[in-house]
């Protein structure tokens, strides 16, 4: 069984496209063929009471009940980079974003490269870590990083930066959501956690804007990566592996460029396959992912989860033409070679 997930492909009808959605408008003969020959229906990937997000949708698709396992994306991303959380640790996704004139301009810091972001994250960990010993910044991928607050409280409201472009970032700062009287053992209050995170956010702006990397960016007329934005926090989740939930899955893999998906794979007991050139953007190695999925099945995997982030990133950037391209790339450069290969096998392969 192979699941191919084009993250963020779904969208609203677009007037410029004659009232069609991007999936309706895009040229996708292989997706169309699979839909025609297979079974189609509506799948609720975000249960009632949960905000739409990749951590919810992808783990739901794998069969996890969010009421039992949901802890936000931070702990999943921690697992993917090998950070071992303690039970009292609060793990948050930490974007490096761009703000101008008090507003969020981009959620990705001007498309940061991982190597550049690593310099900034290590700098923040060194400088802010001196004043805040219970805080750790850990490098992830591109603009997506990890912030760990030892003894932090998860009952806080953090706004995902990609949901608030051109909004005043001061009005979106972290807020507590539990009364002061409700204290969890081993954790500081949610008010203290919110105050700590807001202080880190505010202090990061001056530190980042005065870093040589951003000074050079500003000289070149490029957007600075000038503010941290923590969100998606939670504690270490308690998840069964897919093999424990579904005994027919003896061996499985996940293929993704995104830490979050790799983290889900870690807790699901899946092998993470790293594909060279897989970027999470439109220039990702579609062919390499297809080849890796085919090889995993040949090697005896019962289940392969192939995740492609490119369409989601194009959507967040508001780039309609690029998003159309990513959907068509997925069809022609990833789905096509997989379908063409497995259709020659004697053993049937289910493709979702």
Name these PLM-found stretches:
Residues 10-137, 142, 146-148, 152:
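Active-site nucleophile/metal-coordination loop of metallo-enzymes that catalyze phosphate/sulfate
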Residues 108-228, 233-235:
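Glycine-rich, mobile lid/loop segments that gate access to catalytic sites or pores
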Residues 191, 320, 333-337:
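Gly/His-enriched, cation/cofactor- and phosphate-binding structural elements
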Residues 24-27, 140, 197, 254-257, ...:
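Active-site-proximal structural scaffolding
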Residues 1-3:
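Extreme N-terminal starter segment of soluble prokaryotic enzymes
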Residues 230, 235-322:
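Anion-binding catalytic surfaces of enzymes that hydrolyze or transfer phosphate/sulfate esters
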Residues 326-352:
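Metal-dependent active-site segment of extracytoplasmic phospho-/sulfohydrolases and closely related
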């Amino acid at each position: 069984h192979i699941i191919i997930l084009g993250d963020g492909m779904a969208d609203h009808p677009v007037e410029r496209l004659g009232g069609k959605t991007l999936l309706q408008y895009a040229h996708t003969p292989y997706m169309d063929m699979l839909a025609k020959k297979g079974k189609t229906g509506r799948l609720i990937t975000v249960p009632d009471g949960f905000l739409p997000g990749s951590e919810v949708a992808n783990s739901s698709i794998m069969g996890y009940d969010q009421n039992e396992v949901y802890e936000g994306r931070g702990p999943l991303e921690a697992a993917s980079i090998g950070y071992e959380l303690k039970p009292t640790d609060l793990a948050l996704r930490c974007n490096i974003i761009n703000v101008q004139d008090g507003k969020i301009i981009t959620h990705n810091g001007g498309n940061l490269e991982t190597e550049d972001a690593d310099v900034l994250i290590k700098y923040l960990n060194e400088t802010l870590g001196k004043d805040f010993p219970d805080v750790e910044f850990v490098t992830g991928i591109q603009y997506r990083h990890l912030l760990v607050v030892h003894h932090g409280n998860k009952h806080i409201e953090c706004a995902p930066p990609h949901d608030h472009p051109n909004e005043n970032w001061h009005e979106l700062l972290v807020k507590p959501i539990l009364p002061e009287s409700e204290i969890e053992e081993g954790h500081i209050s949610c008010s203290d956690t919110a105050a700590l995170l807001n202080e880190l956010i505010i202090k990061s702006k001056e530190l980042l804007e005065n870093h040589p990397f951003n000074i050079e960016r500003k000289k070149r007329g490029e957007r600075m990566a000038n503010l941290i934005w923590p969100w998606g926090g939670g504690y270490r989740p308690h998840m069964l592996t897919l093999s424990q939930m579904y005994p027919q899955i003896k061996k499985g893999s996940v293929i993704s460029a995104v830490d979050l998906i790799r983290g889900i794979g870690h807790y699901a007991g899946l092998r993470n396959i790293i594909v060279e050139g897989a970027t999470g953007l439109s220039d990702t190695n579609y062919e390499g992912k297809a080849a890796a999925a085919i090889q995993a099945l040949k090697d005896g995997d019962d289940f392969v989860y192939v995740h492609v982030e490119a369409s989601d990133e194009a959507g967040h950037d508001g780039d309609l033409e690029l998003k159309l391209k990513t959907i068509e790339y997925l069809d022609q450069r990833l789905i096509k070679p997989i379908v063409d290969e497995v259709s020659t096998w004697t053993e049937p392969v289910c493709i979702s």
